[in-house]
Amino acid sequence: DYASGDLKNYLENNDIPFGNRIDLCLQIANGLKELKDIGYYHRDLKPDNILMFDDTWKIGDLGLIAFRDKDNIYDKKNDFIGPKGWLSPEAMNKYLQSDNNKYKFDCNIDHQSDVFQLGKVFWYILQGNAPIGNIRRSDFFDGHDDIYSVLKYMLNHSKKKRPISIDYVINELSRI
């Protein structure tokens, strides 16, 4: 099967109502849940890797996918794992860490890393840009505090303060 396009081009060329954007986020979240449920981390989520097949959105480009609890060739220190601008904080820490750094950072790339990247993709879907740094309420368009709260949780720079499961994200999106 060939994709008819990617999310980036779709959003650039279509005016999509807010409710449809939430549905799009939910469809992508369910795709990530499917990967998680069979034991995989994607690690390369970005708009260019969300592909449309007929009227269905699917997560593509599985080149950096990793099976949970298995060593992966891309998990060495200083390896750049994932797309620039869409990396989770732990992926960036892994890339930048040095042997003589007395501070130890959580550099495990896992499902919560995918949740962070997915939060960036959702922000892009809703705002038309990628969030940079710590997000603030004033960075987000007026109204829709419910979705902002979900995004802020997903985009927390501390993995310990991020959703531990994509199920939480799906449940919250379903209520909007």
Protein language model regions, located:
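Catalytic-loop of the protein kinase fold
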Residues: K36-M52
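Activation segment/activation loop of eukaryotic-type protein kinase catalytic domains
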Residues: F53-W86
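A conserved short helix/loop substructure at the end of the activation segment
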Residues: L155-Y168
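AlphaC helix of the protein kinase catalytic domain
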Residues: L7-I16
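Conserved C-terminal C-lobe helix
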Residues: G143-N156
